[in-house]
Structure formats: C-alpha cells, structure tokens
C-alpha cells in the first residue's frame, strides 16, 4: 500500500435524517467529475474507464469532466482510456491541473473539441513512447516494430487532435517537448486557458 492510499480524504454529507461518508473521488463522481491524479497503469486505467462507462450509462447526454494531473505512463493503458473517451456518447471535458505529460497529454488533447482546458500554471509535455527490448535478435525486431507502430499511432492521434501537421508532431515528440498552458493553447492541445470558474 502506498502512503497516498492512506491519505484519501473522506467527505461527510448530512441531511436531516442521516449522514453519509464518501471518499473524495466518489463524491466528485456524483458531480460527474473523474480525477486522474496518478501515473497511468492498467489499474488506474481500469478505474477511469469504469467511471466513464458508469457516468455515460447514468446520463449519456451530460458532460463528464476529466481532471488530469499525471506524469503519463503505460501507452496501452492510456489507449484504453482514450478509446473509451471516443466510444462513449457523453462529451468528455478535459482539464489539466498541474501537469499532463506523455500519455496524459494525449488524453488531455482527446477531450471533446471546444471543451479542452488547462489552468494557467499547468505544464504539458509530449514525447515519443518509451520502451526497450532485449533477447534474441528476432524478438528485438518484433518489439521494435511494435514500438514504431505505437509511436506512429500516438503521433497520428496528436496530429488529428491538435491540427498540427504529422511531420511537426514527429519532430516535436522526438525528445521531451514541454509547453506552458498558453503554449499548449497555441499548439492546439487545449481550447482555452481558464483562470477562474468565477469568470
């Protein structure tokens, strides 16, 4: 068990008749908010996918808000979230708080067009998928071919979602490519930088 697992706040709601305790993530879910605040692995992806499917089943015509503060992670796990976002009927509003790096940046850009946001001090980072291979040469060839396929897939998604030419995406993702919220806006990763919900 990670230390952060022990620090999840509980929210208590009171009505005239009873009290009910929720962990903070369950309480946010009541308001159609999903919070991706960890590195993306299969476990995290399964939780996010389940929440997206639940909220769509509850009301497919209402938006789902996906808040992102993640360093990225597993591409295959991230693609499970991406595919679900594209599959469900509900619009998915993406909001970057803190950072959206690597696969998390792909998810940020994959929200519903016109509904992709970043807070002013957010950081977004793109790069090529990471991987490695060892073993017999034939196995290394197989793994290399798959890594190149995934790299091309991610670059194609980013090109479609940002409107940037594929060759620019390929150049920019060749190494870590950091952007401020406003640079991400100019790049087409987000549609607006939001300073306050009050405005």
Swiss-Prot record:
Please name the InterPro entries in this protein's record.
ClpP, ClpP/crotonase-like_dom_sf, ClpP/TepA, ClpP_His_AS, ClpP_Ser_AS
Active site residues per record: 102 (nucleophile), 127
Enumerate the catalysed reactions.
Hydrolysis of proteins to small peptides in the presence of ATP and magnesium. alpha-casein is the usual test substrate. In the absence of ATP, only oligopeptides shorter than five residues are hydrolyzed (such as succinyl-Leu-Tyr-|-NHMec, and Leu-Tyr-Leu-|-Tyr-Trp, in which cleavage of the -Tyr-|-Leu- and -Tyr-|-Trp bonds also occurs)
Q: What Pfam family does this protein match (any one)? A: CLP_protease
Q: What is its main location?
A: cytoplasm
The protein's location, in the record's own words, is: Cytoplasm
Q: Which GO terms describe its molecular function?
A: ATP-dependent peptidase activity; ATPase binding; serine-type endopeptidase activity
The residue range of the signal peptide is none
Q: Which Gene3D superfamilies match?
A: 2-enoyl-CoA Hydratase, Chain A, domain 1 (3.90.226.10)
GO CC terms in record:
cytoplasm; endopeptidase Clp complex
Q: Which GO terms describe its biological process?
A: protein quality control for misfolded or incompletely synthesized proteins
Keyword entries, A-Z: Cytoplasm, Hydrolase, Protease, Serine protease
Is Signal among this UniProt entry's keywords?
A: no
What is this enzyme's EC?
Answer: 3.4.21.92
Q: Which PROSITE patterns match?
A: CLP_PROTEASE_HIS, CLP_PROTEASE_SER
Q: Which family does it belong to?
A: Belongs to the peptidase S14 family.
NCBIfam families given for it? Answer: clpP, PRK00277.1, PRK12553.1
This protein's assembly is summarised as: Fourteen ClpP subunits assemble into 2 heptameric rings which stack back to back to give a disk-like structure with a central cavity, resembling the structure of eukaryotic proteasomes.
HAMAP family found in the cross-reference section: ClpP
Instruction: Please describe what this protein does.
Output: Cleaves peptides in various proteins in a process that requires ATP hydrolysis. Has a chymotrypsin-like activity. Plays a major role in the degradation of misfolded proteins.
Record protein name field = ATP-dependent Clp protease proteolytic subunit
Originating species: Pseudothermotoga lettingae (strain ATCC BAA-301 / DSM 14385 / NBRC 107922 / TMO)
């Amino acid at each position: 068990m990670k230390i952060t697992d022990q620090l999840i706040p509980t929210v208590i709601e009171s009505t005239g008749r009873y009290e009910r305790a929720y962990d903070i993530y369950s309480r946010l879910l009541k308001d159609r908010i999903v919070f991706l605040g960890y590195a993306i692995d299969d476990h995290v992806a399964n939780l996010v996918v389940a929440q997206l499917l639940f909220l769509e089943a509850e009301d497919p015509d209402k938006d789902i808000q996906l808040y992102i503060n993640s360093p990225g992670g597993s591409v295959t796990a991230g693609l499970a979230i991406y595919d679900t976002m594209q599959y469900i009927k509900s619009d998915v509003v993406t909001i970057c708080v803190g950072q959206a790096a690597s696969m998390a940046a792909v998810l940020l850009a994959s929200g519903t067009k016109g509904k992709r946001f970043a807070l002013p001090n957010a950081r977004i980072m793109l790069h090529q998928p990471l991987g490695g291979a060892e073993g017999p040469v034939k196995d290394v060839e197989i793994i290399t071919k798959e890594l190149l396929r995934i790299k091309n897939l991610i670059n194609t998604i980013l090109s479609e979602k940002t409107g940037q030419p594929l060759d620019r995406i390929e150049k920019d993702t060749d190494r870590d490519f950091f952007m401020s919220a406003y640079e991400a806006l100019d790049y087409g990763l987000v549609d607006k930088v939001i300073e306050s919900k009050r405005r």
